[in-house]
Amino acid sequence: MMTVYGFQQVQLLNLAYAFQHIQDKNIDKQLISTNNFIKEDIFLHTTISTLTDKSLDIEKNMFTNKDSFELNKYSIEEFTVPSGSHPHDVAPAPDGTIWYTAQGSGELGHLDPSTGVTRHIQLGNGSAPHGVIVGPDDAPWITDGGLNAIVRVDPITNETRIFSLPEDIAYANLNTATFDQSGILWFTGQSGMYGRLDPANGNIKIFSSPKGPGPYGITTTPDGEVYFASLAGSYIARIDLESGNVTILEPPTPEQGARRVWSDSFNRIWVSEWNSGKLGVYNPDNKSWNEWQIPGENPLPYAVYVDEHDMVWISDFASNSLLRFDPILEKFGEFKLPTKDAKVRQLLGIHGEVWGAESNTDKLVRIQMSN
């Protein structure tokens, strides 16, 4: 791969986007230096000049062939979890182990990838956990549709703390959660609501979602905004963290079925469009949308996740694969899942790894960058 001044091509391409991002916002280029993009403006101009050189066009064409994204540098591995678990979501812990919701057995699961050993923690009678994330306290937090509650599990003692929804919310069909930068947990319920939980005092506030049922995926951006997607409503929404009110943002394709959302490092919101078979992105800087048709026959994009290199990962039920999308080259790369009809419903990662839950096979899957 081409290297310039110690930067690999993907880094240069991302730097080019960063430079364009800054230009679009009319920020003085000197700010780039103070934000550690690079040390000197002259180096920026040299780098951008290199990016626009014809030699890069040649290299770019080479980079986007069948071996684009250097897919051969990645390995894919599955980990078996107890039968009947039907894992729905995964959440890597700081120590490299993996939490997962065992929706089929009403438990929280834990996998040590170095040994393959799993353990399960019971969450209570009627539990049907959907989402799990690791909070700022390093503990797993679960959205449990069966218990109609948010559940925190102590990662050391396995002690559970249940935050039940208000009694007037009979069944929220709890889905996914995210922490904002103030430590407030925001969550969605497909029955037609979203809410906030203050872990410090246990207070929960519920809001009715626009257009009724549908709230599904939710994400926090680097600048602290919180967005959720509505599958039935076919929109994404930005939440005002003070009032709880939302601004609806509709993708260009009608009835597209926005299912999950994730933010990249530029605060852009990536959307898996279940009904339309597209990958969408919303840019809050200029309030613009873009969409790409996912390759293959009748694609069904479910999960979406953006890694530390701003590469976008999608699970596709139709092709039984995970896809990696480069937003600068606008190219997809495909990783076929080893087990047929895996149904990966959620993706999350840590440095150099992307994890998914195979809800139909009682397995977790990892894509890992080789050294």
Model-identified regions with their sequence ranges:
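Short loop/turn segments that connect beta-strands within beta-propeller blades
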Residues: 112-116, 154-158, 198-202, 240-244, ...
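Blade-level signature of beta-propeller repeat domains, shared across WD40, Kelch, NHL, RCC1
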Residues: 343-371
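Conserved beta-strand positions in repeat-built beta-propeller and related beta-rich domains
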Residues: 99-104, 142-146, 185-191, 228-232, ...
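A short loop-to-beta-strand structural motif that recurs across blades of beta-propeller domains
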Residues: 107-109, 149-151, 193-195, 235-237, ...
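Short, compositionally biased, intrinsically disordered N-terminal export/targeting signals
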Residues: 2-19, 44
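A short beta-strand motif characteristic of beta-propeller blades
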Residues: 77-80, 117-122, 159-166, 203-208, ...
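A short helix->beta-strand "capping" segment at the edge of beta-propeller domains
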Residues: 63-83
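Beta-rich, blade/repeat-based domains predominating
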Residues: 83-94, 125-136, 168-182, 211-223, ...
